């Protein structure tokens, strides 16, 4: 894979301004898939234009879905099929490294008609999918692994799945449950999905349930221990569907304001958001920043920051931003219960620990936690980004010190936020 040229970020002396964050990746791909199988036309606005979304759109084209994109690719009119997918010949879908496309598509295709292969980039072949496949097999799915047991690529023969009692592992990724929930209304009979172990990233399940409701399907949530879904249902087009701004993407700008002492307002997300990652602002507040909430914005004003010791299982993506914010906080910051960092775009616990040490931090990397003690002065270094958009964006915050930083392969942010560095520059002095 070709890499983009390294980007040198010189020290930023001041931060202030307003940023409208692009649409949420989680919401964009969920809404596209449900719009595709719904009855009628859905008009999506503020859709994210990024690699992960393009992989989903290309797959939907291969699966016979008609849609129209606006010139700036942030509006999409999807003509729903009114049913699961149906293909005559084997369709091979390449999904890059998009977990939000791979997992839900796997579940919906298992209960569609035809033969499908799901493939992706080399890293996708290291991201587990076994827990989802096991659950789908309980419902009657025919899925085989083409390389390694428990990992993509996969081949499946779609068929009518019966539903019934299904158990799913909750501890590795909430995307397995999300995928099952989205597919379950298409099963022949009612389903009771039982969670085995602790369910991680519960707020992402709330996003799924909220999105399903906008497409006419309600799910009985039994305190996140089990979920009851009626079978043989049809999704209904949502009409106009506004994709909220991405709360994980907002975290970098909010952190920048907190660190540098200016005032930064992020629009597109606010107190009415359905995304759990807005709770990132609460962590900044606990560290000492001043937070103001509006319906459609979050505003932060910086102040001297102090370290925190917190369970951040509920905000796994935004918690990464706390790891670099910790470089500017007094004391030792501990981020706990984040095992699922290890099964994301890269092993994020190992990657963050390695790069934080390069800038001079004292780091302890546990199996499911990380502690960070900042140095007196950050060290100028080149940050490796591991083809992980969030690593690149997190370490851009180093430039808020008196130390320049070089970000290797900065274009990896294209996965969720192609013009991130341009937006950061717009609020920097």
UniProtKB/Swiss-Prot annotation:
Belongs to the EPSP synthase family. It is an enzyme of class 2 (transferase). One of its GO terms (biological process) is aromatic amino acid family biosynthetic process. Its main location: cytoplasm. Phosphoenolpyruvate binds at residues 25, 99, 127, 175, 348, 390, 415. InterPro entries: Enolpyruvate_Tfrase_dom (IPR001986), Enolpyruvate_Tfrase_sf (IPR036968), EPSP_synthase (IPR006264), EPSP_synthase_CS (IPR023193), RNA3'P_cycl/enolpyr_Trfase_a/b (IPR013792). GO terms for molecular function: 3-phosphoshikimate 1-carboxyvinyltransferase activity. Keywords: Amino-acid biosynthesis, Aromatic amino acid biosynthesis, Cytoplasm, Transferase. The keyword Transcription does not apply. HAMAP family: EPSP_synth. Catalyzes the transfer of the enolpyruvyl moiety of phosphoenolpyruvate (PEP) to the 5-hydroxyl of shikimate-3-phosphate (S3P) to produce enolpyruvyl shikimate-3-phosphate and inorganic phosphate. It catalyses: 3-phosphoshikimate + phosphoenolpyruvate = 5-O-(1-carboxyvinyl)-3-phosphoshikimate + phosphate. Pathway: Metabolic intermediate biosynthesis; chorismate biosynthesis; chorismate from D-erythrose 4-phosphate and phosphoenolpyruvate: step 6/7. Monomer. Pfam families: EPSP_synthase (PF00275). This is 3-phosphoshikimate 1-carboxyvinyltransferase. Its EC number is 2.5.1.19. The active site is at 317 (proton acceptor). 3-phosphoshikimate binds at residues 25-26, 30, 173-175, 201, 317, 340, 344. One of its GO terms (cellular component) is cytoplasm. It is found in: Cytoplasm.
């Amino acid at each position: 894979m070709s890499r983009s040229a390294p980007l040198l970020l010189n020290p930023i002396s001041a931060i202030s301004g307003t940023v409208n964050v692009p649409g949420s990746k989680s919401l964009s791909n969920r809404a596209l898939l449900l719009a595709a199988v719904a009855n009628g036309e859905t008009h999506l606005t503020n859709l994210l234009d990024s690699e992960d979304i393009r992989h989903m759109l290309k797959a939907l084209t291969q699966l016979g879905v008609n849609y129209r994109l606006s010139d700036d690719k942030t509006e999409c009119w999807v003509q729903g099929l009114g049913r699961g997918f149906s293909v005559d010949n084997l369709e091979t879908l390449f999904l890059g490294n998009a977990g939000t496309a791979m997992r839900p598509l796997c579940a919906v295709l298992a209960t569609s008609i035809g033969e499908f292969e799901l493939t992706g980039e080399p890293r996708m072949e290291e991201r587990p999918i076994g827990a989802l496949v096991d659950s789908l097999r309980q419902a009657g799915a025919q899925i085989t692994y083409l390389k390694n047991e428990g990992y993509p690529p996969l081949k499946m023969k779609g068929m009518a799945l019966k539903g019934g009692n299904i158990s799913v592992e909750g501890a590795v990724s909430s995307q397995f449950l999300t995928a099952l929930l989205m597919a379950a209304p298409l099963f022949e009979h009612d389903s009771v999905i039982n969670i085995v172990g602790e369910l991680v990233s519960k707020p992402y399940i709330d996003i799924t349930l909220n999105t399903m409701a906008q497409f006419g399907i309600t799910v009985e949530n039994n305190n996140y221990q089990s979920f009851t879904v009626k079978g043989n249902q049809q999704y209904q087009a949502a009409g106009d569907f506004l994709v909220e701004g991405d709360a994980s993407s907002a975290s970098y700008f909010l952190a920048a304001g907190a660190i540098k002492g200016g005032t930064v307002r992020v629009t597109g997300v606010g107190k009415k958001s359905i995304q759990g990652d807005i709770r990132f602002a609460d962590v900044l507040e606990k560290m000492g920043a001043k937070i103001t909430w509006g319906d459609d914005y979050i505003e932060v004003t910086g102040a001297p920051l102090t370290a925190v010791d917190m369970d951040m299982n509920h905000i796994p993506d935004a918690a990464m931003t706390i790891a670099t914010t910790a470089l500017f906080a007094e004391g030792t910051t501990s981020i706990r219960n984040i095992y699922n960092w290890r099964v994301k775009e890269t092993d994020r616990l190992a990657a963050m620990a390695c790069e934080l040490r390069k800038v001079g931090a004292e780091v302890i990397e546990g199996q499911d936690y990380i502690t960070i003690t900042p140095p007196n002065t950050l060290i100028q270094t080149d940050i490796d980004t591991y083809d992980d958009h969030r690593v690149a964006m997190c370490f851009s915050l180093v430039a808020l010190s008196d130390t320049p930083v070089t970000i290797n392969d900065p274009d990896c942010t294209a996965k969720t936020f192609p013009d991130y560095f341009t937006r950061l520059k717009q609020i920097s002095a």
